[in-house]
Amino acid sequence: MANKFVITWDNMQMYTRQLAEQLLPAEQWKGILAVSRGGLVPAAILARELNIRYVDTVCISSYDHDHQRDMTVVKAMEGDGEGFIIIDDLVDSGDTAVKLRQMYPKGKLVTVCAKPAGIDLVDAYVVDIPQDTWIEQPWDMAVTYVDPICKK
């Protein structure tokens, strides 16, 4: 994908706090189910903002940095998801979301970002992303020194 959307750590916190506002009142939730790995950071932020202490993971592998591949469920939580926020960083093609809906039909599936192909599969999200755009997450990047333009 030629187009990129960069999310900084500050943006991730801001977007996830906006998502938390959509999930009030906090007392309705038994816990948070983070989709590993993309949902881990948003889950920590949601846990803080909603004062939720019970956090579990569902581990689904479908990407190698910037390439989608076959989906594998590595670890799953028991139950149908009732009373749980299921959080991932992004809904893209919707393949992971479909799997999560099958596994946890009573959970509230939310993402920080959503692309058009998967948007109808989530209950809440914050940022619209064009389908042809790759998202660079803060945990995949580092701040580095760049020479001034005049030195090139």
Curated annotation (Swiss-Prot):
Binding residues for xanthine: 92, 135
What is an example of a Pfam family matching this protein? Pribosyltran
In Swiss-Prot or TrEMBL terms, this protein is called Xanthine-guanine phosphoribosyltransferase
Positions that bind 5-phospho-alpha-D-ribose 1-diphosphate: 37-38, 69, 88-96
The positions annotated for binding GMP are: 69, 92-96, 134-135
**The gene coding this protein:** gpt
Lineage, please? Bacteria, Pseudomonadati, Pseudomonadota, Gammaproteobacteria, Vibrionales
Which residues participate in guanine binding? Answer: 92, 135
Q: Which InterPro entries match?
A: PRibTrfase_dom, PRTase-like, Xanthine_Guanine_PRibTrfase
The entry marks the following residues as binding Mg(2+), namely: 89
- Gene Ontology MF terms: guanine phosphoribosyltransferase activity; hypoxanthine phosphoribosyltransferase activity; magnesium ion binding; xanthine phosphoribosyltransferase activity
